[in-house]
Amino acid sequence: MTVGMVPGASIAGMVFSLVVSFALPIGLFVYAKKKLGAKAAPFFIGCGVFFVMVLVLEAAVHRIVFQLAGEALTGSVILYAVYGGLMAALFEETGRYIAMRFLVKPMDFPNAFMYGAGHGGVEAMLLCGVASISNIAGAVMINSGTLSAQLAALDAEKAADTAAALSALWTTSSLTFFAGGVERIIAVVLHLSLSILVFQSIRKKSQKDLLNAYLFHFVIDSLSVLLSAVASVWVVELVAALVTGGAVLMAKYACMEE
């Protein structure tokens, strides 16, 4: 396989997504600390809850379910979307509720906001930030000629496999690399909104607000999987933005209710 050049616009998209993934959480942390008077601890509690509930517990359940269900689940886009949405909502919102109910002290609006910044922020850094760093490193290797030199030292089969694995960096539309950053902005706003909903559910002892948090999380994850199979990444992000807008309005309404 011939190694192409990674367009400058693609690298710009990678850098944009990288900056968003780290600058947004840091900016929100500073804002919540300086402007809202939040404590720092809820940010790191949010980071920890995401790690434990998603990367450890949810991932373990996925391994078991996929092993048992096999293609019966992964072979159906609808079933896979429903399953993915349910698991994401169950683990993340349950973790959010437990953290806010028992760990975040005092449980007030500034600390709920700070928790959401941590939960959504660490997700951005780990999922998009790390991938962006890898993409940028690969692009630099390709454009500098380092990759071609390394491939020349491999046998034909390994060289072809390596080039194929990296080919997306020069064959993917440049705009697509900006999508990761846009997606993270939407996701962080969603996590802030869901954190406020869960906070209000605890403050007001309102099951409705908690159920809304579960529902919005399920809907956005399920729709993202479904639409990814039939539509462009920008259609997926548009729908995600609309659903997130609904979550923002619901959180605002919950704050206005007594």
State the predicted function of each range:
Residues 1-258:
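Hydrophobic alpha-helical segments at protein termini of multi-pass membrane proteins
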